């Protein structure tokens, strides 16, 4: 989760907490609580299991994925479908 996503989650949580404190949150009537990804409207797509998780040559990632360098781990990783994919 990147910093922007974390800030959005914290903002959402603080807004919900503030509304609960004021008693302004409407009661749910038979609806399930939506997942955080639905609340943040993340796009999902079908990802093949053959997508690599790492990209040492910076060109191994599946279409639509981004090869990103981690300073902490000194490695290139595929971000997107390949994250944790079929390495």
Curated annotation (Swiss-Prot):
Residues making up the signal peptide according to the UniProt record: 1-18
Localisation: Secreted
GO CC annotations on file: extracellular region
Organism domain of life: Eukaryota
Distribution of this protein across tissues and organs: Expressed by the venom duct.
Claim: Cytoplasm is one of the keywords in the record: no
PTM notes: Contains 4 disulfide bonds.
Residues passing through the membrane, by range: none
Task performed by this protein: May interact and inhibit Cav3.1/CACNA1G calcium channels. In a ex vivo model, shows ability to block nerve signal transduction.
Protein name: Conotoxin QcMNCL-XIII0.1
């Amino acid at each position: 989760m990147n910093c922007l996503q974390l800030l959005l989650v914290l903002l959402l949580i603080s807004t919900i907490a503030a509304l609960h404190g004021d008693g302004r949150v409407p009661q749910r009537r038979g609806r399930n609580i939506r997942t955080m990804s639905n609340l943040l409207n993340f796009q999902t797509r079908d990802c093949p299991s053959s997508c690599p998780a790492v990209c040492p040559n910076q060109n191994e990632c599946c279409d639509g994925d981004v090869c990103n360098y981690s300073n902490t781990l000194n490695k290139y990783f595929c971000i997107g479908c390949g994250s944790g994919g079929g390495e």
